[in-house]
Amino acid sequence: MDEITFRRKINFCFYFRHVYICVLIALFLQSSAYSQTSDKNRDKKRKVEILYADLLTNENPGSDQKKLLGNVSLKHNDILMYCDSAYLYQKSNLVKAFGKVHIEQGDTLDLYGNYLFYDGTEEKALITGKVELIDKETHLFTSSVDYDVANKIASYTDSGRITNAKNTLTSIIGIYYADQKMFHFKDSVKIVNPDYIMTGDTMDYNTETETAFFTGPSEIKGDSIYIYCEKGWYDTKNDVSRMWKNAVINNKQQIIKGDSVFYEAKTGFGQAFRNISIADTSNDVLVKGDFAWYYKKPEKFMVTDRAMFIQISKDDSLFLHADTISAVTVGDTAGKSFRLMRAFYGCRIFSNDLQSKCDSLSYSFQDSVIRLYYAPVIWSEENQLTSDSVAIFTKNRQADRMELYNSAFITSLVDSVRFNQIKGRSLKGYFRNNKLYKINIEGNGEAIYFLEDKDELIGVNHAKSSSIEIYVDKGKITDIYEYQNPDGKLDPPLSNLPETLKLPGFNWFDIIRPKKVSDIFRK
């Protein structure tokens, strides 16, 4: 035999030995698994044992039926069964028990009833009569329960009532998973708590955490709050909830909606996420955005991410956008409370008759005054008004008058290059039917305005006066009156270049004017 042939035979022997060892290991593992499965099956098929009975009879000789009377005790795997009397069918491993039936499983679960049918092979039990299941502090009352002993699952289909220290829960259908301490309820689900009533079509309830999980349309009603959602959870122990899908919170002052809502009932604190709205029906106010938080006491809220405030009016609603909108309820010196709304950063206002832009503003529901700060601009029909700060006084949700403080300036367009301009230290504007009709300028008044006759320019007036009064009709200046040391001149309309006909401080901001509601979100 040559060396190559010898090596091939040696390698084959080693290969065969390796395969042989692998086969032995596989057979061992299979045998072990089969042995474990067989052990489990033997445990499962273990016969029901008789622990005690006052009297044991065999009514039918040759039959496997045994009759047990008085203080009956039976055992099967990890459960104990007690009753007044029972029939035990040993071959089929069945039990029929009567009177004061009690199943005990482990240290915590007890099941009581008037009648029991138990299949030891399948480890399934049916308990009827006045059924009570007790698992620690949770009590289930119903007329009939199917109990899967091996998996510790109890179910009922003919109305049940569950109680613990604080809550009483009822439903038509229920399933209890004892290992997970979880109930699944369906059909006419209701939780009654001293502070609220919770209802729904489908609900899960964890008995350890005392948390209810909603998987269908659900409502929570209390003395001062109403909650609706179609998905979410409510921690009944700590009064904390999280809701999704058409979530609504109504606390009698506001109605809060959002794609997702979090609420702590004890503190009155809530958060809402995406597509949120807060409606104040008493003041006809609606606030929208993509994030909000809310406190009930003291009452306050904040909205950001595409925040929008809407003052609802039948004739002309007002729309406000800002980076952040907040409101707080405060008290005055007379002890009365009122709401103060604030908006910060990039404020824009749109209504049909009035538009505005500023950095920040406030709105007092006490005196119905809107105050604009930091480079405010107001547009009313054809007129643009600017100053250091502005106060707009409203009545019946319409502008009544406005006051411009420091460097007041009013501008209107005559043609593409010419502007009527009036400026002064302060300005008061008056509205009729939400339209500007009169303006009073006080202190250091100056004016450049063009005279027209049948839409034809006939002159340009330069005027100075301590006091100027202007009348407006349909957005156009119709009359100007100068009081207290007036001084001025009238020039032909084309005697000056347009760029020279501008007062110090002139600006034209028409490019940033909101012309429709969506423009308030324009950067």
Predicted ranges, named:
Residues 34-523:
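N-terminal amphipathic/hydrophobic interface segments
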Residues 1-41:
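Bacterial Sec-dependent N-terminal signal peptides
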